[in-house]
Amino acid sequence: MRKIFLVLSICFVSIFFVVSCASREIYVYFNTDCIIDISGIHSNKAKTNISAFLDETDNTLSTSIVNSDISKINKAQANEIIYVKDPTIYLLNLAKEIYEFDSSFNPAIFPIVELWNFSPETFTGIAVDSIPDEATIAVALQSCSFENIVWDSSNNSVYKTDTNAKIDFGGIAKGYACDGSFELAKDMRQIVINIGGTIKTNHEITVHIKNPRPENNQFAAKILVPENNAIATSGDYERYYFYNNQRYHHIFDSSGHPAWVNSDNPILSVSIVGPSATICDALSTLLFINGLNTQMELILSNYSSSALILYEDHYEKYGELSVEFLESNYL
């Protein structure tokens, strides 16, 4: 784990936020920067507790740490029982809740993620010479049903019905880490937690959303995040590579292909604002795959969340969201 002390505003891959503070600390977990901006009595103790929490969470939920819960599940044989920690069961239950509403949010898509070389161990961002063929994708999809993962919340046991089934909480873990860190800092006067671009704050802040296809401006819009709310953004510009001049990104739909990859009007990014960073994280992935429709509006309403969806030359918005656009494409 790496820790850095800074007094400057930091620009990140997907989101930039500005907040005045005396100091901030950056830790590296989940293969990303985790920024802790808090001030108040006993703030140093709170930061120490947050660092310990992030370390434990990463070691529990990572797909790349050998002895994590997720790695143990992924390496297990069919019907081999694995006993896991409370956060794993909590996220399995929450993921199932969202999956049952719309199966596009599927933590069991990880065999497809690996097939396309988007796992932490294989992704490089360098243009590739080939992509998976349809037959290979079809075989991998056979192991990608979330129904292959079975767990018992009463004793924290998990097993798989398919040896090749694997899970990945990449679409929800940063939000969980953000909410948990925020809770540990709840007695502080000023709080902004930023876990790889998933942000939660106890006071109103302005967040700059990166322009997915920057030409004139680095940022596409500014969103006002109310107090005790969070924001998460998913986009096709975060992890991608090119093949035959076509961009392939890391967010997969149920066909086993990157969402919108062959569309003439693809979604480029989705930002969700709401009270739960975990839910914002999950819904930004879900809406990136599905776009804004009646069903997505219902789930946003159920979770008291708002959405901003950016296309190449227009946008869609749902809910009470204060947005100022900075890029001419969206004015």
Give residue ranges: language-model regions.
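Mature catalytic core of soluble alpha/beta enzymes
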Residues: 2-8, 12-331
